[in-house]
């Protein structure tokens, strides 16, 4: 499936959550929190400002980002979990 976000929407693929703690303990699936970082798969063209001009997106495909853990709408593409969210829900780009 090919998905192209509109306006200021971003398609993000979540990164896998940690399998074990820093101390070496394995975390069961039921106790894992969903990660709040991921990779931008696709981004829309941007949003239209009040004056009618297009405000370009800051993020682009391939960027690693940090986002609010309740951000976006979960969807599955070819069995892989993704999120569609607004660019405003992205807190930072990880460099």
UniProtKB/Swiss-Prot annotation:
GO terms for molecular function: ATP binding; metal ion binding; protein folding chaperone; protein-folding chaperone binding; unfolded protein binding. One of its GO terms (biological process) is chaperone cofactor-dependent protein refolding. GO terms for cellular component: cytoplasm. It holds the Pfam family Cpn10. The keyword Cytoplasm applies. Keywords: Chaperone, Cytoplasm. It is found in: Cytoplasm. InterPro entries: Chaperonin_GroES (IPR020818), Chaperonin_GroES_sf (IPR037124), Chaprnonin_Cpn10_CS (IPR018369), GroES-like_sf (IPR011032). Its main location: cytoplasm. Heptamer of 7 subunits arranged in a ring. Interacts with the chaperonin GroEL. NCBIfam families: PRK00364.1-2, PRK00364.1-5, PRK00364.2-2, PRK00364.2-4, PRK00364.2-5. Together with the chaperonin GroEL, plays an essential role in assisting protein folding. The GroEL-GroES system forms a nano-cage that allows encapsulation of the non-native substrate proteins and provides a physical environment optimized to promote and accelerate protein folding. GroES binds to the apical surface of the GroEL ring, thereby capping the opening of the GroEL channel. Belongs to the GroES chaperonin family. This is Co-chaperonin GroES. The lineage of its organism: Bacteria, Pseudomonadati, Thermodesulfobacteriota, Desulfovibrionia, Desulfovibrionales.
């Amino acid at each position: 499936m090919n998905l192209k976000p509109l306006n200021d929407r971003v398609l993000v693929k979540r990164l896998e959550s940690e399998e074990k703690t820093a101390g070496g303990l394995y975390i069961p699936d039921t106790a894992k929190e969903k990660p709040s970082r991921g990779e931008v798969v696709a981004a829309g063209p941007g949003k239209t400002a009040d004056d009618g001009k297009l405000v370009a997106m800051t993020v682009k495909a391939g960027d690693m980002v940090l986002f609010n853990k309740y951000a976006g709408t979960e969807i599955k593409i070819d069995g892989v979990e993704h999120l569609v969210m607004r660019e405003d829900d992205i807190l930072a780009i990880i460099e």
